[in-house]
């Protein structure tokens, strides 16, 4: 398959995700092969798959991102830190960390700060803090964004995809709050190139999706390919 400049331009934003609970080693092989084929910069996977992914992507330009505390964010800070350290030791270079939403709702800002800061400081990796914007008020979104930026997160990620996907409105809101201080990752429910490009236009620097290959194929033959069903 030959990729055009426009294909590669969209591909450069995609974190190619394999985050279904039933994912097999064979599916991970396919995910990594697709990331390499389509020039996606990152695969986003569960910690259990990091070692295999690092081996599969040896000498490739694709980075490995592990999700931490995913998808609920309700494990202890000690557990999240251990999970993050182990992912780093196994070769992950990025971490998508789910914040504790219960703490946010209860006003426990310091607990959230300490948790994210400890992961950032002790691993030294690129950390994307997942906010789950679909279950937050605008006030809570702003507070969560400010806490995670102060704690050292490099990106704010809209959602896990388990409770609704990214919206243009939320990406714009986070862009306004962050003022370019950190990146924004739009994630979940991205099914068409038009949607992907609209999220980028709104301010997204990364797109988290399992549909990356389909997005590129739709760009190549938009009249022949129907939007796929989301996972």
UniProtKB/Swiss-Prot annotation:
InterPro entries: Aldolase_TIM, DeoC, DeoC/FbaB/LacD_aldolase, DeoC_typeI. One of its GO terms (biological process) is deoxyribonucleotide catabolic process. It is an enzyme of class 4 (lyase). Belongs to the DeoC/FbaB aldolase family. DeoC type 1 subfamily. Pathway: Carbohydrate degradation; 2-deoxy-D-ribose 1-phosphate degradation; D-glyceraldehyde 3-phosphate and acetaldehyde from 2-deoxy-alpha-D-ribose 1-phosphate: step 2/2. PANTHER family: DEOXYRIBOSE-PHOSPHATE ALDOLASE (PTHR10889:SF1). Transmembrane segments: none annotated. Its EC number is 4.1.2.4. It is found in: Cytoplasm. Its main location: cytoplasm. One of its GO terms (molecular function) is deoxyribose-phosphate aldolase activity. It comes from Gloeothece citriformis (strain PCC 7424) (Cyanothece sp. (strain PCC 7424)). One of its GO terms (cellular component) is cytoplasm. The active site is at residues 96, 157, 185. The gene is deoC. Catalyzes a reversible aldol reaction between acetaldehyde and D-glyceraldehyde 3-phosphate to generate 2-deoxy-D-ribose 5-phosphate. Residues 209-231 are annotated as: Disordered. The keyword Secreted does not apply. Keywords: Cytoplasm, Lyase, Schiff base. It catalyses: 2-deoxy-D-ribose 5-phosphate = D-glyceraldehyde 3-phosphate + acetaldehyde. This is Deoxyribose-phosphate aldolase.
